[in-house]
Amino acid sequence: MATKFPKFSQGLASDPTTRRIWFGIATAHDFETHDGMTEEKLYQKIFASHFGQLAIIFLWTSGNLFHVAWQGNFEKWGEDPLHVRPIAHTIWDPHFGQPAVEAFTRGGASAPVNIAYSGVYQWWYTIGMRTNVDLYNGSLFLLFVAGLFLFAGWLHLQPTFAPAVSWFKNAESRLNHHLSGLFGVSSLAWTGHLVHVAIPASRGETVRWDNFLTTLPHPAGLAPFFTGQWAVYAQNPDTAGHIFGTSEGAGTAILTFLGGFHPQTQSLWLTDMAHHHLAIAVVFIIAGHQYRTNFGIGHSMKEILEAHTAPSGRLGAGHTGLFDTVNNSLHFQLGLALASVGVLCSLTAQHMYSMPPYAFLAQDFTTQAALYSHHQYIAGFIMCGAFAHGAIFFIRDYDPEANKGNVLARMLEHKEAIISHLSWVSLFLGFHTLGLYVHNDVMQAFGTPEKQILIEPVFAQWIQAAQGKALYGFDILLSGDNAATAAGNSIYLPGWLAGINSSTNSLFLPIGPGDFLVHHAIALGLHTTTLILVKGALDARGSKLMPDKKDFGYSFPCDGPGRGGTCDISAWDAFYLAVFWELNTVSWTVFYFHWKHLALWQGNSAQFDESSTYIMGWLRDYLWLNSSQLINGYNPFGMNSLSVWAWMFLFGHLIYATGFMFLISWRGYWQELIETLVWAHERTPLANFVKWNDKPVALSIVQARLVGLTHFAVGFVLTYAAFVIASTSGKFG
C-alpha cells in the first residue's frame, strides 16, 4: 500500500477520517512534532527553508523587473514622472468587452494595462536605473541568485554540508557576522552603489560596468579620504534648482548633511542618504567585532547577562539563565525576531510618506496610500505572530528550574499586575474616547455643534514645536535675544527647518481635536490587542484554575463538552481574538492616515478637521463619501477603470462575510452538515462513481475558528485595498 499523507506523522497517516488531511496540512511546518525529529535535523530543516524563502523573494522581485521591462513604460515614465502613469503589466482577459478594453488602455499603452501603485518605478529610477535593458539585467541577475539560493538550501541538507547543532547555537559568532556582514557590509555596499551609480545618474551621468572604474564619483577622487579632509566630500551639494536626472543645478558633493527634501522630487537628498548608510556601515562593522569568538577578546553574551543582577537584591536573579533560555529556544528567538521586524515594518509605513526616500514618490498619492496601508497591515500580522511564538515558548521550551528568580520568572509571578494594568488602561481609553465621540455625535444631531468637547493636543503640538514647527506660536516662550536661543537654532539642519514648516509635505502635519480623538482610539486598539496577546502568553502554561497545562499544547481550544471554564488558559484562543482587535486597530490607523491625507492632498484640511470629531463624520464623510464610486462602480450605463476595484470591493465583503459563517457556529453544526452531505452523496447513483476511504468528520473547534479568522482577515484586507486604491486614484488619477 502506498504511504498516505502525511509522511511525517505515522499517527495521522493511519487516521481513518478526513482529519488526516486537515491536521496534516496544519502541522506540515511544525517540524518539532514530526516523527523521528532530532534537534539537529530540526535546525537543519529550518536553515534550509530560509534559503527557499530567499529564493522565492528573489524570484518575485525578478518577476516584477521582468514584467515592467517587457510590458511597462519605464523609459517613457522617466522622461515625465509626474504626468505619465507607470504600468505594472498588461492585462489579457477574454472577458473584456470593448468598454473595458478602452477603460484600461492608459499610460500611453496600446492594450489594457494595470497601473503600478507599488512605488517600484520611483525606486528603480532613484537608484540609477534608466532603461529597459537595466531592468532586464536586474531581472536575470536576481533569477540567477534565486537559483543559487535553491541550490544552497539543497546543499546544506546533504550530510557533508549540513551544519551541526553547535554551529547554530554559537550565538556570538552569529551576532558578529550578522552585525558586520548582514548590516555593516551590505550598508557599505549600498553606500557604494549610491555614490558610484545613483548620485551620478541623478546628475545626468550614466555609470555602468563599462565605465565604472574610469568614472570618478567625486572630482577630488580618494585624496580627501586619505588626507583626512573628509569635509571636501560635503562641499558643493546640489542646488535647490537642481533638475533630477540632469546636470542642471547639480553639485559635486557625495556625502552631505543637508536635511529636508529635494525641492523638485520632494524626496530626501540622495547625498544625505549615502551619508546615512555610510554611518550605519561604520557603526555596524565595529559592532560586529564586539563579541568574543576566536581570539579570546571581546564580550561574552553569557557573562554580560549573568552579571546583570541588581545590587539591591530587590530585582531577584536579574538576567541569570537567560542566555541559555534564549539560545536553546527557537520560539523565543522567532518571537524576538518577529517583534523587531513588526516594529520595523510599521516604522517603514510611517517614514515612507513623512520622509519619502524615492524621487517623485511624494507626488504619487495613490502609491503613498497603498504603501502605508500595506506596511501597517503586514506589521500588525507579524507582531501578533511574535506573541504566538512567545506563548509557544512558555508551553514547549520554558524551564522553571533554569529561570528561578530571574526577570522571566518574576514577570510570570506578577502577571496579575501586568494584566490588570493593561485591562485598566484599555477600559479607561475605551470609555473616555467613546464617551467624547458619542457626546460630539449627540451635539451634532441636536443642532448644537458648538457644544462639542474639542480638546487641543497641546502636548503633541509642543513636541512638534520642539522639532522646529513654527505654526503654533510656541516660540513666544523663547527669549529671542538670548545667547542660548541663538545657539539652539543652529542645531537644526537648514533643510529640515524648511521641510518641517512647508505645507506641501507630510512632515509633522498640523493637528487638532480630531487627531487627538483618533490618536486615543488607536491607543485603545493597541492596548486591548496587547492585553489579549500578553494575557494569552502569560497564562499559556496555566492560571489559578489550572496550574500547569503544558501537555495540552498550544492549539488547545477552550470550549466544548467537559472543558468548561478553561478559556482563560488557551493561548490559541487569545491569539485568535487578538487578531480581530489587531485588524480593527490597523484599520483605524490607516483610516486616519488616508482621510487626513486626502484632505491635505486636495488642499482642504477643513473637511477632516470638522468631520473627524464625531463618529457620523467618519462614517459619512470618510467611508461612505469615498466608497461612493465603488458602490456605483459598474451599472446599466457602463463601466470605467474603477470597475475592477468596485468588483473587488464587493468580493472582499463577500469573503469577509463568509468568515462569520465559521465563527458563529459550533462543531456539532458542521458534523450534522457533513453527515447530511454524505447521506445525500451515497443515495445519488451518479455520485457513487466517486468513492473515498476517509470517514468524513467535521472541522475541529480550532480549525473552524482558523478558517473563519482567515476569511475575515483576507476579506477585510481585500475590501480596504480596493477602497484605498480606487478612492485615491479616482480623485488624483
UniProtKB/Swiss-Prot annotation:
Sequence intervals crossing the membrane: 46-69, 135-158, 175-199, 273-291, 330-353, 369-395, 417-439, 516-534, 574-595, 642-664, 706-726
Residues noted as binding phylloquinone in the record, renumbered to the chain: 670
Pfam families named in the record: PsaA_PsaB
Amino acids binding chlorophyll a B1: 653
UniProt KW keywords: 4Fe-4S, Chlorophyll, Chloroplast, Chromophore, Electron transport, Iron, Iron-sulfur, Magnesium, Membrane, Metal-binding, Oxidoreductase, Photosynthesis, Photosystem I, Plastid, Thylakoid, Transmembrane, Transmembrane helix, Transport
Membrane topology, as annotated: Multi-pass membrane protein
Alphabetical GO biological process terms: photosynthesis
NCBIfam families reported in the protein's UniProt record: psaB
Protein's UniProt name: Photosystem I P700 chlorophyll a apoprotein A2
Gene: psaB
